[in-house]
Curated annotation (Swiss-Prot):
Residues 66-328 form the Protein kinase domain. The gene is MKK1b. GO terms for cellular component: cytoplasm. CDD domains: PKc_MAPKK_plant_like. Its EC number is 2.7.12.2. One of its GO terms (biological process) is response to chitin. This is Mitogen-activated protein kinase kinase 1b. SUPFAM superfamilies: Protein kinase-like (PK-like). Induction: Slightly induced in response to chitosan. It comes from Physcomitrium patens. The active site is at residue 190. The keyword ATP-binding applies. It comes from the Eukaryota.
């Protein structure tokens, strides 16, 4: 059973503490892991020189400032609520993660906190993280609220996204990926429709950095197996080393899915998706890559998808080159503003 803690209008379920989490708590109830410390005041980054809050104290929110509006979503480890600041009426998404969770999820949360801090307010194509807290067994992350949901939500509503709007979406996502890859040396590792969020202003932003990886340089590689396997590149599915271009494969599949209205790799005789990982791996690794049907889409779109979905990583175009692709130049954001996408 869980007890409930009342904090400024938010009813937060407090999990029964398990022994595993105790290793990461100080005597004062501060959550610490690697170089971060998190408490009811916020996130602190610990270095050999100093320990300071990630944001100036006078600029910090507190959980007591926020009141719940409604639940946006729930998962096994927590929930996301729409919340309102009592004094400013600003709206946020509050992600709450219960810390009676397994080791893998804990590591993902800590990684997300670190990535959020690295990218804080520095790129308009990444969902902003305003503050993070730890209190009574729950990590709370205050995020920018994207009021139209994800591309996955849009597909459910519209079935397919028209090609001109996909050019605008691709342009914004590629700018976000270019920042992650070239400036922050981060591989997202989980680009998919549900992690690309959109708002009424027509902005598309990258979210969810729980499985992202920070590399030491623009030429470095990784070899760990994390992320949503259906969108993984062949080298990742095959257990080989991979780099930034693995995100390009995932983006290509995502955009093609938005265009078709279904996941491009379809199980034989099924429409509901993949239940067998090894069948999908066999198809992605050993068969020719999927492509945009030329009888349904423009040559520019087909070329763009082909530039992303290449089995050899070196054959995929970089974010910088894709931003110059004719498909992105063909449609203007002014003419096809995403606020008109219905």
């Amino acid at each position: 059973m869980s007890r409930r803690h009342r904090t400024g209008g938010l009813r937060v379920a407090v999990p029964k503490q398990e022994n595993s989490i105790h290793r990461f708590l100080t005597a004062n109830g501060v959550f610490h892991d690697d170089d971060i410390q998190l408490d009811h005041m916020g996130l602190r980054v610990v270095s050999s020189e100093s320990t300071a809050y990630a944001n100036p104290p006078d600029a910090q929110l507190s959980l007591a400032d926020l009141e719940a509006v409604r639940v946006l979503g729930k998962g096994a480890g927590g929930s996301v609520q729409l919340v309102r600041h009592k004094w400013t009426n600003d709206i946020y998404a509050l992600k709450g993660i219960q810390m009676n969770i397994n080791e893998t999820v804990r590591k993902q949360i800590v990684q997300e906190l670190k990535i959020n801090q690295l990218t804080l307010h520095q790129c308009p194509y990444i969902v902003k993280c305003y503050h993070s807290f730890y209190h009574n067994g729950i990590i709370s992350i205050v995020l920018e609220y994207m009021d139209r949901g994800s591309l996955a939500d849009i597909i459910k509503q519209t079935k397919q996204i028209p090609e001109p709007y996909l050019a605008v979406i691709s342009n914004q996502v590629l700018k976000g990926l270019n920042y992650l890859h070239q400036v922050r040396h981060i591989i997202h590792r989980d680009i998919k429709p549900s992690n690309l969020l959109i708002n009424q202003k027509g902005e598309v932003k990258i979210s969810d950095f729980g499985v992202s990886a920070v590399l030491i340089s623009s030429m470095a590689q990784r070899d760990t197996f994390v992320g949503t396997y259906t969108y993984m590149s062949p080298e990742r599915l095959g257990g080989q080393s991979y780099a930034y271009d693995s995100d390009i494969w995932s983006l290509g599949l995502t955009i093609l899915e938005c265009a078709l209205g279904y996941f491009p790799y379809r199980p034989p005789g099924q429409e509901e998706g993949w239940n067998n990982f090894f069948m999908l791996m066999e198809l992605v690794i050993n068969q020719p890559p999927v492509a945009a049907p030329p009888d349904k889409f423009s040559p520019e779109f087909c070329s763009f998808i082909a530039a992303c979905i290449q089995k050899r990583p070196g054959d995929r175009l970089s974010t910088a080159d894709l931003l110059k692709h004719p498909f992105l130049q063909k449609y203007s954001e002014e003419e096809y503003h995403l606020s008109n996408l219905r």
